[in-house]
Amino acid sequence: MESSSSSNSYFSVGPTSPSAVVLLYSKELKKWDEFEDILEERRHVSDLKFAMKCYTPLVYKGITPCKPIDIKCSVLNSEEIHYVIKQLSKESLQSVDVLREEVSEILDEMSHKLRLGAIRFCAFTLSKVFKQIFSKVCVNEEGIQKLQRAIQEHPVVLLPSHRSYIDFLMLSFLLYNYDLPVPVIAAGMDFLGMKMVGELLRMSGAFFMRRTFGGNKLYWAVFSEYVKTMLRNGYAPVEFFLEGTRSRSAKTLTPKFGLLNIVMEPFFKREVFDTYLVPISISYDKILEETLYVYELLGVPKPKESTTGLLKARKILSENFGSIHVYFGDPVSLRSLAAGRMSRSSYNLVPRYIPQKQSEDMHAFVTEVAYKMELLQIENMVLSPWTLIVAVLLQNRPSMDFDALVEKTLWLKGLTQAFGGFLIWPDNKPAEEVVPASILLHSNIASLVKDQVILKVDSGDSEVVDGLMLQHITLLMCSAYRNQLLNIFVRPSLVAVALQMTPGFRKEDVYSCFRFLRDVFADEFIFLPGNTLKDFEEGCYLLCKSEAIQVTTKDILVTEKGNTVLEFLVGLFKPFVESYQIICKYLLSEEEDHFSEEQYLAAVRKFTSQLLDQGTSQCYDVLSSDVQKNALAACVRLGVVEKKKINNNCIFNVNEPATTKLEEMLGCKTPIGKPATAKL
């Protein structure tokens, strides 16, 4: 955390100099690119004709892409792999030939077999499926044009958000549609277990990686060299998900750095002049896996990927999932990001083929870039009216008068746009039409009955999932849609919560509380490391812009109009504050000296279910394994829980005094203090 002195620059800004804050932190209303519905043409042109069209994608610097077998040969014969094999042969006393054979086997398991025939088959099939389940697939054409130029100039890395299995299928479909090279995609080994489907994905550009490498130096060397070879040759755009896995809660997950490290290396070793990173935001009106995700969050194991499971999922073809919006962000030059920040000279001191241990500066740079890319994804995520509707309903459950819901939704629409949210309102229709249409799309969650909008939380008492009630499933499903709003609202909302938790109005005290909350919830939301002060300033600016607060030299004052805004924002984040309080109470009640993560998750679920059954809590969000895991990570980071590794297993011990202090600080029983420390 920053020291308390870091706040001085902000506290010198008073109402007499608002222009500085406006220039630095205003979120100007963007002139959003025009979206094109690509399904419109698909509905009028034969799918077979589309699949068999003349496909001549633009290529990197006009070179002829090499064949998949050539990439494998290049990796197998690379200096880096030769060096690693020699080193491992000395360490393990295995012969070079045996290790070389192992490299060949790894490549056979890993490599894609990109073939035009498979791409055409997927284009034909996906066109039919997408037309059946989606009303629109909207793409920003300006983003596509920028991507077209980027692909011809430098190697390109596509970094899409990850909310559904549809994500990577959709991107390949779109790039084929626009005559761009279909990407090579980093996919989990899970898909290889699917008969025929795994091979079809391989022939459509997927290359497969193990979830964990387990310290396997040879596997890591082969995998990284394989990715770098494709990147250096400009063979095709390389695509992977920074989040590492699909977000079950619809919040952006904290980034994983492994693949980003790999794709940056050719630039730092001067093997390519530049590399373009392209953040892509994929937004869904309705997630295909919404029910499956909630089951997983409630502790039901994720079903194994299988062809049988895929065939059973055919029933979704009879459902309507609304629209998808895909926003291709501006290509970001790695060279520009590194300019004046990172020197490449250290890579000149040793031959390129010798692996180097990553420096602290490089790790910090990769971390910063990863978070910046995710923030760009968030900035361009499209919000649907349903996210507003469900956010209002969750603060007025179980039912709400239709006219009141329309009024409150319109109010929230204005606030969302003031905060810079990318909100798509269907064809500028009146709210009286949009709200019922949204409810109809999500009829499994809510319904309109006699001018009352009702969340389906009381439709049955039967136990559905391991003793969990149907209403838990419905409410967690609602939370996932509400969470889409939190990415935009997090900074002003944390200021609002800090104002509520702070006695008095002193700006410095509010900032200390904000900093404490930001640190506690660092695993829940995406914050640029070391950016606490600017996040606070942005939150304050947006609240000033919405006329909720006034900032003086020393104080933050709530306006008469601001009470409504702050009350809503506090309500939006109340589930997270309460969830962490409940988890602290569980940790204090834990009788075991140590426990594993699996034991913790099962015990927290049982503890919170009892509170809900007794009626002593109405916080259903704490049932989510996503919240439970993030809270445990926060507790470890804050010193509330100690994490140890014994025999390759992680165990946890509770620090009771620190846990008590955290619970009291979240419950406003203990002042946050100045400065709020990184460790409790």
Curated annotation (Swiss-Prot):
Topology in the lipid bilayer = Peripheral membrane protein
What family does the entry list?
A: Belongs to the GPAT/DAPAT family.
Return the protein name.
Dihydroxyacetone phosphate acyltransferase
Under catalytic activity, the entry for this protein gives: dihydroxyacetone phosphate + an acyl-CoA = a 1-acylglycerone 3-phosphate + CoA; dihydroxyacetone phosphate + hexadecanoyl-CoA = 1-hexadecanoylglycerone 3-phosphate + CoA
Query: How changing residue 519 to G affects the protein?
Result: In RCDP2; likely benign; decreased glycerone-phosphate O-acyltransferase activity
| SUPFAM superfamilies reported for this sequence | Glycerol-3-phosphate (1)-acyltransferase
Q: Which Pfam families does the UniProt record give?
A: Acyltransferase, GPAT_C
* Disease tied to this protein: Rhizomelic chondrodysplasia punctata 2: A form of rhizomelic chondrodysplasia punctata, a disease characterized by severely disturbed endochondral bone formation, rhizomelic shortening of femur and humerus, vertebral disorders, dwarfism, cataract, cutaneous lesions, facial dysmorphism, and severe intellectual disability with spasticity.
Its assembly, as annotated, is: Part of a heterotrimeric complex composed of GNPAT, AGPS and a modified form of GNPAT.
| Molecular functions per Gene Ontology | glycerone-phosphate O-acyltransferase activity
Q: Indicate yes or no for the key word Acyltransferase.
A: yes
